[in-house]
Amino acid sequence: MYQKLLLVPLLLTSALASPHDASSHQKFHQLNERAAFPIPASKGSQTFKEPYYVKGTYDGGMKTFGRGVKCTGQKEGGDKDAVFIVADGGILRNAIIGADQIEGVHCEGSCTIENVWWQEVCEDALTFKGTGTGVHKVIGGGAQGADDKVIQHNSGGSAIIQDFTVQNFGKLYRSCGNCKKQFKRTVQISGVKASNGKTLVGINPNLGDSATIDGCASSVKEICVEYEGTDNNGKEPKKAHSGPSNTCKFKEPLASC
């Protein structure tokens, strides 16, 4: 009887301790993941009252740039909400986009986004706009905390994404699924480091889209998803396929990061 009485408190102590220990371990793991995001140290900050328009080349000197506003989640914004608007042929490099913004960076046509980092993505990090068939390059840099898309491709042409780091995200790249004016789009991704995401790439093969993907991915549910794109802006595109195909080109599985 004495042994049984001793055993009960010990079991109760163990039962009470286990959830706490698991929770602490989970929080510690989450903090470690956040700390691992390799965003460079900021060399200052600047808040814009309106979008900064980039013609030619703009080097941000690794400062943090924002708009001094709170993120509005997945509520659709516009050009007026961007931190930078990059003109056709423009180059934006060496910048950190702060959390105090809504729309991040917009490209009006062909552009190069080099070594640009997003502290926390709001609606989208980077949007390719316009009506042309240009080349959109993303070289280095990274983003985290996107509830949905990191890179939204609305215009036509190609996207080249090299050595980009993305963590805790919905989609790294999405070819617009229901834009009123649709285009054929291609995306080439190499050297990507992706972790804790839902979908790496989403394309619309019925509109001529294709994707080539190489890099590493950890805890990413789907690497490449094919949709039936539409020009009906009020309709969500249907998911058609997930995995390697003639239009989703990658070796399954991708290496773990």
Swiss-Prot record:
Signal peptide residue numbers: 1-17
Keywords annotated in UniProt: Calcium, Carbohydrate metabolism, Cell wall biogenesis/degradation, Lyase, Polysaccharide degradation, Secreted, Signal
Superkingdom of the source species: Eukaryota
Chief location category: secreted
EC number in record: 4.2.2.2
GO MF annotation list: pectate lyase activity
Cofactor binding note from Swiss-Prot or TrEMBL: Binds 1 Ca(2+) ion per subunit.
One Pfam family linked to the record: Pectate_lyase
Subcellular location: Secreted
InterPro entries recorded: Pectate_lyase_PlyH/PlyE-like, Pectin_lyas_fold, Pectin_lyase_fold/virulence
SUPFAM superfamilies in alphabetical order: Pectin lyase-like
Gene3D superfamilies: Single-stranded right-handed beta-helix, Pectin lyase-like
Protein task: Pectinolytic enzyme consist of four classes of enzymes: pectin lyase, polygalacturonase, pectin methylesterase and rhamnogalacturonase. Among pectinolytic enzymes, pectin lyase is the most important in depolymerization of pectin, since it cleaves internal glycosidic bonds of highly methylated pectins. Favors pectate, the anion, over pectin, the methyl ester.
Family matches, as PANTHER family: PECTATE LYASE E, PECTATE LYASE F-RELATED
Family of the protein in this entry: Belongs to the polysaccharide lyase 3 family.
Protein name: Probable pectate lyase E
Recorded name of the encoding gene: plyE
